[in-house]
Structure formats: structure tokens, C-alpha cells
A protein has these predicted regions:
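Amphipathic alpha-helical domain-onset/packing element
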Residues: 3-55
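Short, flexible loop/turn motifs enriched in small residues
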Residues: 55-62
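Conserved ABC ATPase signature
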Residues: 63-93, 118
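Short basic/glycine-enriched coil/helix segment immediately N-terminal to the Walker B
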Residues: 80, 98-107
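Conserved D-loop-proximal element of ABC-family nucleotide-binding domains
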Residues: 82, 103, 119-120, 124
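Conserved hydrophobic alpha-helix in the ABC-type ATPase nucleotide-binding domain
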Residues: 90, 125-130
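Loop/turn-to-beta-strand initiation segments
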Residues: 105-107, 135-139
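ABC-family nucleotide-binding domains
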Residues: 112, 116-120
């Protein structure tokens, strides 16, 4: 089990390491910027470890640090309204899609009910992002 957890931690950590080519935010932050909320996101991964009885895992979480207009936000759970949270979530999702480039001719984006819950401040930027950054997915 320890070996498996080490393999997972090593691979997953690369998604959050700023110097890694696998870093999520290399693709997600530019998308988030296009929403115009002036939010800078930093993600920190706390490595998984087994419980002492090896029946479960603990410390398996990702923490988000937020800056707004270059100022650190100490209580993001209070600061982030639904529109900002939606923009962050969509940016991470689309950043992961962009990061994992598909070398196949048919590129599909599954957005399902994403537009239903979006307010107008996010709908228009999202349409622009899809048009500019995911044009090859719209064929």
C-alpha cells in the first residue's frame, strides 16, 4: 500500500508543482483571467498518507489560496461568491482539458448543464473562451 500511495503522491504532486510542465494552473489561470474577476489562484496539495491501521487514507486534500487584485484573501470561503466559484471551477476543468491535449481528430467538450447555473457575468466570457481557446473542439 505504501508503494501505491507514493506513486500516487508523486504523480499527483506534479499537477500542483509550479515548476512542473504538468502544473494545472499553467492552463487554468489564463482561462480564469479571461473571466475578468481579477483572481489569482494558487493550489497546494497535501500528500495522502495511510492511517495507522491502513484501513483508510488521510490528509487527501487540495487547498486553494486566493489573491484578489494582488491582495491575499485570508477567508476565501467568505470572499468567493457563486460567480467567482463557478469561474474558478470552469477554469480548472477547461485547463485540465487543455493540458491533456487529445491527439485525435474528434475533440469533444462535455459541458452538460454548465450554462444553466451560470450568471450572465460568466456566460459571455465563457462563450468567448470556448470560441478563442477551444475552437477546434467546436467542429
Amino acid at each position: 500500500m505504501d508503494r501505491t500511495i507514493n506513486i500516487f503522491n508523486t504523480a499527483f504532486k506534479k499537477l500542483f508543482d509550479e515548476s512542473s510542465i504538468e502544473n494545472i494552473l499553467k492552463y487554468s489561470q489564463p482561462i480564469l483571467d479571461k473571466f475578468g474577476h481579477n483572481i489569482e489562484l494558487k493550489l497546494q496539495y497535501t500528500q495522502v498518507k495511510p492511517t495507522s491501521d491502513y484501513k483508510d487514507i488521510e490528509r487527501n486534500h487540495v487547498r486553494a489560496k486566493i489573491k484578489y487584485l494582488s491582495k491575499q484573501i485570508d477567508k476565501p470561503h467568505i470572499f468567493l461568491n457563486e460567480a467567482r466559484l463557478s469561474a474558478i471551477a470552469i477554469s480548472i476543468y477547461l485547463g485540465m482539458v487543455k493540458r491533456h491535449i487529445q491527439g485525435i481528430p474528434c475533440k469533444v467538450l462535455f459541458l452538460d448543464d454548465i450554462f444553466i447555473g451560470l450568471d450572465i457575468s460568466n456566460r459571455l466570457p465563457l462563450l468567448e473562451i470556448l470560441k478563442s481557446d477551444f475552437d477546434s473542439y467546436q467542429d
